[in-house]
Amino acid sequence: MPARWLLLLLALLLPPPGPGSFGRTSTVTLPETLLFVSTLDGSLHAVSKRTGSIKWTLKEDPVLQVPTHVEEPAFLPDPNDGSLYTLGGKNNEGLTKLPFTIPELVQASPCRSSDGILYMGKKQDIWYVIDLLTGEKQQTLSSAFADSLCPSTSLLYLGRTEYTITMYDTKTRELRWNATYFDYAASLPEDDVDYKMSHFVSNGDGLVVTVDSESGDVLWIQNYASPVVAFYVWQGEVLRKVVHINVAVETLRYLTFMSGEVGRITKWKYPFPKETEAKSKLTPTLYVGKYSTSLYASPSMVHEGVAVVPRGSTLPLLEGPQTDGVTIGDKGECVITPSTDLKFDPGLKGKSKLNYLRNYWLLIGHHETPLSASTKMLERFPNNLPKHRENVIPADSEKRSFEEVINIVGQTSDNTPTTVSQDVEEKLARAPAKPEAPVDSMLKDMATIILSTFLLVGWVAFIITYPLSVHQQRQLQHQQFQKELEKIQLLQQQQLPFHPHGDLTQDPEFLDSSGPFSESSGTSSPSPSPRASNHSLHPSSSASRAGTSPSLEQDDEDEETRMVIVGKISFCPKDVLGHGAEGTIVYKGMFDNRDVAVKRILPECFSFADREVQLLRESDEHPNVIRYFCTEKDRQFQYIAIELCAATLQEYVEQKDFAHLGLEPITLLHQTTSGLAHLHSLNIVHRDLKPHNILLSMPNAHGRIKAMISDFGLCKKLAVGRHSFSRRSGVPGTEGWIAPEMLSEDCKDNPTYTVDIFSAGCVFYYVISEGNHPFGKSLQRQANILLGACNLDCFHSDKHEDVIARELIEKMIAMDPQQRPSAKHVLKHPFFWSLEKQLQFFQDVSDRIEKEALDGPIVRQLERGGRAVVKMDWRENITVPLQTDLRKFRTYKGGSVRDLLRAMRNKKHHYRELPVEVQETLGSIPDDFVRYFTSRFPHLLSHTYQAMELCRHERLFQTYYWHEPTEPQPPVIPYAL
């Protein structure tokens, strides 16, 4: 139980609040002990310390207010204490922590930087007089005014301070950046052995877990809908801060062993799963989150398995980090604490800073704790203000960038601190003794203007005349090239060596741009020497300086052993991986010292290859879509380098001795569907999904493999706003895997994305049945598809897993395309749920319908056909110890699905209080417990899931159902009181 001990250790290390924190005031008697929770949206919740339930809420302005219209975000503020982080300096060194906060900047203002930026700060205090019983604001006290106050004995005085920092550019006369930070007046935390609670807060949302500091038990869990920034208790006459720990939401769920909807009191009623020692250690990070339309930063603790951006990294590439391994549950569902091994781009590598700033939202996530910057506070006042030597920073010789608005400087070579006055003396000594005369300055400006005018006129003339001469030269070269090309074709027929004309070989730009000789795209860069051919055979003698083509074969060499090199792609012709349609051959090759698969495509298919490459570029950032590297061309072929894979899905299923390497069938299907959902989100229809086009990757560093969708040759990119495509260009796909609407003459509507869902349904059955097809043998498949004659005999109606799989596959291969679910619907289906999630779903359903009327729409839907689900009387189908225990407390109806779910929920909640024989018959929670019921009532999960679709829009059930963004909201079914 390392996770539980770790949480207890963290709770003990928290500095607890001072004495008198439980309900003591000098003039007001608290009706109950309160805890005050401040959230990022400006709310102050008065909550019960015992349960965390909200008694009342005071709503004010958000804790942070930063501009949203600036092109580049200058700083990331911390809502916990007003700390500031920069997004990088001159060298894009990533996030950097500044050694001062917004309140400290306000304290130091007014000040001015050397590049003309004025800093202005404002601090405004305000007092709120609050009715302690209702939370109503009775009076507001500020320096401007004070309302009248009615006398009361239960009043609470809360002070709040507003810090505003503004930066103004004197050159552009525009506001550069500003921020407002609010904080409640409170004393600092103190040691208090009587305070027995520790608070853990998740980053990015309002989840709070309060733990008993001594036992480590979870006292209560609440979600306050906005990130929590501070906790306070009432001591004497003022608030006093209580220390809390910010934790990643994945880590918090891991530590408390929770999943699904939170918001109820939960304690550890069963031990944690066995985890490695390393995974139980928490690491400090910096979490960058988003509130409204702006970013903020906050310290956060994470456990091993949470992806962390390395220190000094800037934004990752758009294709995302490289994933060497992902921990996924046995049933295809990501576990609560996924373990990933991510490799981020170490830097921008020459990418423009503009693109970096436009994509700064990609910073959201956990980063390694940044280094602190060595900075100096600028305190140079404008000329019309009184100057003091210690407050003046002279103009710097270098123009400071926007990221250095607060004058971020490196440490001196001897690592000794330099004071502001010393810096002033050094720079005054280097300053010129006499300013430049105004007349000399005007003469220099006039000379500059005249020279610039002449240069501009000459440049315009060059731009006008140069394209004409270049166009004439290109026409002559093109005519000459056509003549030489005719010679090539004639000499190739006679198998004679060809010597191109000297003028052509002397023009590298012509060779690089003409096309038939060389073309690189994707991640491949042009050849360093444009004169060198991009296609060569090795071993072979080097090309002669006269321009002999090295791609022609030498009579004394074995063709099968030559290494073909085209640009950055190389391969050996004997390493054939497979053959495709239209003469396509796939070789094992190399690209940038990486093993790849090389597709060699004939000229007749160049247009299809270009379309495939374009679609690969758009979609390959997903881990379950084949990765594309580059494209090269020579005179005869086009070559596409893609990710090298170990096998196809067909080999995975049909070869009995195939090493699965931990990739279970349901996990494989989940990954395939995830890749398909990604394609559909990009308006791409695959149109040829089959086992042969689903590839399995090479094992990663952890020995794991994953499924990837490949072969984009028949893909269709739909225009924006379109959801269907025409059949006029033919019927794409492979016989036996084509949806019926593609071939049916009776179908008047154009096909849609659902053709892929049909093919995926066939693939699902193929994997689960270990090689069978829902529409029979290969010769009759397509005919059976048109007739709708499917056969799912491998599924048994008395087996829970088969019932769930059959229900999903029947929807996916439905004859009516509109009845098929989307890929995102499929991913939400119980087919992929873990046993833990199944149990949580049953519990949430029981909670939802507990007080619903028997004649209400939800209960009626749940009980419709329910007697068959519970086998007429579920009480007669459970073991005797459980029957005996159920009779002790309440009466259950044996023919009611609702009562069966209620019994499951009650026994799960009171599992530790059950007799030993009942615990033994139910088994451990959650796996054995949920199997106990689903094995006896195999249709229970499927029936309940379909019945509760009425509530799919409710927040409680959004984890279990998917609804399209454009789907109309159904009428709200209110909770029964």
Curated annotation (Swiss-Prot):
List residue numbers at the site (Interacts with hydroxy-aryl-aldehyde inhibitors): Y892
From the UniProt record, give one GO term of the biological process aspect. endoplasmic reticulum unfolded protein response
Q: Name one GO cellular component term.
A: IRE1-TRAF2-ASK1 complex
Annotated protein name in UniProt = Serine/threonine-protein kinase/endoribonuclease IRE1
| Domain KEN stretches | 835-963
- State the family named in the UniProt similarity comment for this chain: Belongs to the protein kinase superfamily. Ser/Thr protein kinase family.
Q: What does this protein do?
A: Serine/threonine-protein kinase and endoribonuclease that acts as a key sensor for the endoplasmic reticulum unfolded protein response (UPR). In unstressed cells, the endoplasmic reticulum luminal domain is maintained in its inactive monomeric state by binding to the endoplasmic reticulum chaperone HSPA5/BiP. Accumulation of misfolded protein in the endoplasmic reticulum causes release of HSPA5/BiP, allowing the luminal domain to homodimerize, promoting autophosphorylation of the kinase domain and subsequent activation of the endoribonuclease activity.
- Compositional bias segments (type: Low complexity): 513-551
The residue stretches assigned to a coiled coil in this entry are none
Cofactors, names only: Mg(2+)
Organism name = Mus musculus (Mouse)
In the record, the effect of F889A is given as: Abolishes endoribonuclease activity
Principal subcellular localization: endoplasmic reticulum
